[in-house]
A protein has these predicted regions:
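Conserved GNAT acetyl-CoA-binding A-motif
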Residues: 141-156
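A conserved beta-strand-loop-helix scaffold within acyl/acetyltransferase catalytic domains
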Residues: 91-95, 99-115
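Thiol-based oxidoreductase modules, predominantly thioredoxin-like and allied folds used
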Residues: 28-41, 51
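Non-catalytic, surface beta->alpha helical segment in thiol-disulfide oxidoreductase systems
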Residues: 59-82
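Conserved acetyl-CoA-binding loop-helix of GNAT-fold acetyltransferases
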Residues: 128-141
Length: 175
């Protein structure tokens, strides 16, 4: 049995969409065709309350019904099955990395043309593991070539930025 089960009907465009998304991500999955396999229909009915509630995923035992792609990526990442990489959510003004048990993020605000990174958060269970510094490094590598000014008000982000001369210069530390 696979870690990813997709319940659906191959004739359904949404089911085909999810099949393509999983294949694009290089993920192995089991296709449970509820219209052709009575056992698959019964398993979906037990999982979702009806055999008609497809497409539905079961990802490492967790039910995920008809997700948008970012939500699917998040569920796959939290299950340790896929790494969508660093995500820049401009609307929420955050850089995000999906992981279990909760996402890591760096928040920022705009002050005119200046990006001000105000906070980093990593699940407390990872404190002291170096994960926060690695995540901050990943964010800094993402933004270091941007033309706009970037300031850091978060003490932890400032501490990490002080480790490299190019970041001290970019973030105007030590001036």
């Amino acid at each position: 049995m696979h870690d990813i089960m997709l319940f659906g009907e191959v004739r359904c465009h949404k089911t085909r969409f999810y099949q393509a998304a999983l294949e694009e991500r290089g993920l192995a999955y089991e296709m449970a065709e509820v219209d052709k396999d009575k056992e698959a229909a019964a398993r979906l009915a037990e999982l979702a309350g009806s055999a008609d509630k497809f497409p539905t995923f079961q990802i490492k035992g967790r039910k995920v019904r008809n997700p948008k792609l970012p939500e699917l990526d998040k569920e796959l990442a939290r299950a340790g099955l896929y790494d969508p990489g660093l995500i820049h959510d401009e609307r929420a003004q955050r850089f995000i990395r999906h992981m279990a048990p909760s996402d890591a993020f760096v928040s920022y605000v705009w002050q005119g043309d200046r990006m001000v990174m105000t906070h980093i958060e990593v699940d407390p269970s990872f404190r002291g593991s170096g994960l926060g510094a690695r995540f901050a490094t990943e964010v800094f590598e993402e933004v270091e070539s941007r033309a706009h000014e970037i300031r850091l008000t978060c003490p932890f982000l400032r501490k990490v930025a002080l480790t490299r001369p190019e970041w001290r210069k970019k973030f105007k530390l030590g001036e």
